[in-house]
């Protein structure tokens, strides 16, 4: 299952508390990426918070993996998790084809 994880900084988080942990954070993110569970990572262009795409069996697994990040362990950040399902809207197009509609290409 794909899980979208949106970082949020927790109250009281200041830049000086982040700095000593950033190298270890990058190392752990790289490990998660190498393991195949972290598929993509981006920064929000306006807020400089992380947006991650994870591949996990369920949201609880994603929450557990994210809890291994040094910034999470230090209580500086947390994540909002959004489980994703495949888009099935294209089925509406195929329904018409099965009702005798011709495929015109």
Task: Describe the residue ranges of each PLM region.
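Conserved, structured core segments of small domains
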Residues: 1-105
């Amino acid at each position: 299952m794909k899980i979208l994880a949106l970082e949020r900084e927790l109250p009281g988080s200041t830049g000086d508390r982040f700095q000593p942990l950033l190298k270890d954070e990058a190392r752990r993110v790289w490990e998660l990426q190498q393991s195949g569970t972290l598929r993509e990572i981006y920064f929000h262009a306006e807020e400089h918070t992380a947006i991650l795409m994870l591949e996990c069996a369920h949201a609880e697994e994603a929450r557990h993996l994210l809890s291994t990040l040094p910034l999470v362990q230090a209580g500086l950040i947390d994540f909002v998790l959004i489980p994703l399902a495949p888009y099935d809207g294209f089925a509406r197009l195929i329904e018409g084809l099965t009702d005798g509609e011709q495929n015109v290409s």
